[in-house]
Amino acid sequence: MQVYLVGGAVRDYLLGHPYQEKDYVVVGATPEHMLAQGFQPVGKDFPVFLHPETKEEYALARTERKSGQGYHGFQFFTDTTVSLEDDLIRRDLTINAIAMDQDGKIYDPYGGQNDLENKILRHVSEAFAEDPLRVLRVARFAARYFPYGFQIAPETLQLMQTMADSGELDALTPERVWKETSRALMENHADIYFQTLRDCGALKHLFPEIDALFGVPQRPEYHPEVDCGIHTLMSLQQACKSNYSLDVRFAVLVHDLGKALTPAEELPRHIMHEERGIKPVTQLCERLRVPTQTKQLALSVCKEHLKCHQIMSLKPGTLWRLLQRLDVLRRPERVEAFVQACECDAKGRLGLEDRPYPQAQYMREAMQIVRSIKVQDLPENIKGAEIGEMLIQYRIEALAEFKNQHQSLSHS
């Protein structure tokens, strides 16, 4: 039997990029051969084995044939007669269809090295269209390799468009869409993922709430970029630039969904867009089965981001209630994530990417103030329900003093 390193590890090796995961293809072996050598079977749909020592994945060379809709609509065939070329042709992109043997020799039957050199993302064969998940994968690769100048081949983008128009994307399970999207959100240029999906017509099928933002105007004095969709992607790029968490990036992505629901006669103003956004954010999260923690932050940012922008003018009681809703006493990290998302919104505007956002520090200091006030700070004779009431009173008074000090400093 012959063993070949394949896929992303070979691609990144040839690009000179670091890689961690290694996947191998085994040609000329049977499941019995693998078991006899101590490999552990793990594949449900086709023979995949874990190496007895390294625990790296070894898959028997296979071919596949479309047998139904969606990601699981395939029949696989594996046999000792299946060649390396047979296995590689079923892969998505030419740059992922390169193999390397144990001596370091490269096998590239479909021109992947040439496409790497020319910075092109190109599908290997028309079988690409049989797996709708590949539309999302190519969009994710476009995001990952955007800084290096990679572009999608026109014929591949056209094929993605055809797939989007065919309705095949509807067969994707929510779990698969979220898994691919959450990975894409953690790329350094996650905005390119969504722009690519829009370019091929997939965004309106998978994320209609986000697609609806494009073409919706905003007031140019606040948003020089004008377009709501462009602002959303610029804000997301700010979150990527700061290397923020998945929760923050997703919250930034959906913070303005309510603007797509603004009545035409009110444009370019977006009065009450925070409240209008609650329903589409909730629908999107439920449809994709977004994790609860991610959904909670997204809803908080959607509902409250304008309050963060206006934080220095908030009354102490209003600020306390905002901090309470963010669970400041039990989850200070959630307040920090909220602030990060709001700052991305403020900076995701044409020409304003580097402007200061003093509201962030103000919010952080306010958080520390309310968290520093403990039961031990109250008079000893306070009992029962009065304890909670007085704690709130003390915290609001402390926020009032903080606001006065801040105003005095800013006017001095």
Swiss-Prot record:
Keywords in alphabetical order: ATP-binding, Hydrolase, Magnesium, Metal-binding, Multifunctional enzyme, Nickel, Nucleotide-binding, Nucleotidyltransferase, RNA repair, RNA-binding, Transferase, tRNA processing
Signal peptide: none
Cofactor note: Magnesium is required for nucleotidyltransferase activity.
Protein species of origin: Acinetobacter baumannii (strain AYE)
UniProt binding sites for Mg(2+): 21, 23
Note: A single active site specifically recognizes both ATP and CTP and is responsible for their addition.
Reaction catalyzed: a tRNA precursor + 2 CTP + ATP = a tRNA with a 3' CCA end + 3 diphosphate; a tRNA with a 3' CCA end + 2 CTP + ATP = a tRNA with a 3' CCACCA end + 3 diphosphate
InterPro entries tied to this protein: CCA_bact, HD/PDEase_dom, HD_domain, NT_sf, PolA_pol_head_dom, PolyA_RNA-bd, tRNA_CCA-adding_enzyme
EC number: 2.7.7.72, 3.1.3.-, 3.1.4.-
GO term, biological process aspect, one: tRNA 3'-terminal CCA addition
HAMAP family per the UniProt record, alphabetical: CCA_bact_type1, CCA_bact_type2
Domain HD, chain residue ranges per copy: 228-329
Name the UniProt record assigns to this protein: Multifunctional CCA protein
Quaternary state and interactors: Monomer. Can also form homodimers and oligomers.
Cofactor annotation: Mg(2+); Ni(2+)
Domain of life the protein comes from: Bacteria
Entry's free-text remark on domains: Comprises two domains: an N-terminal domain containing the nucleotidyltransferase activity and a C-terminal HD domain associated with both phosphodiesterase and phosphatase activities.
Binding-site positions, ATP: 8, 11, 91, 137, 140
Classification via NCBIfam families: PRK10885.1 (NF008137)
Binding site for CTP: 8, 11, 91, 137, 140
Described purpose of this protein according to its UniProt entry: Catalyzes the addition and repair of the essential 3'-terminal CCA sequence in tRNAs without using a nucleic acid template. Adds these three nucleotides in the order of C, C, and A to the tRNA nucleotide-73, using CTP and ATP as substrates and producing inorganic pyrophosphate. tRNA 3'-terminal CCA addition is required both for tRNA processing and repair. Also involved in tRNA surveillance by mediating tandem CCA addition to generate a CCACCA at the 3' terminus of unstable tRNAs. While stable tRNAs receive only 3'-terminal CCA, unstable tRNAs are marked with CCACCA and rapidly degraded.
GO molecular-function terms, A-Z: ATP binding; CCA tRNA nucleotidyltransferase activity; cyclic-nucleotide phosphodiesterase activity; magnesium ion binding; phosphatase activity; tRNA binding
Entry similarity comment: Belongs to the tRNA nucleotidyltransferase/poly(A) polymerase family. Bacterial CCA-adding enzyme type 1 subfamily.
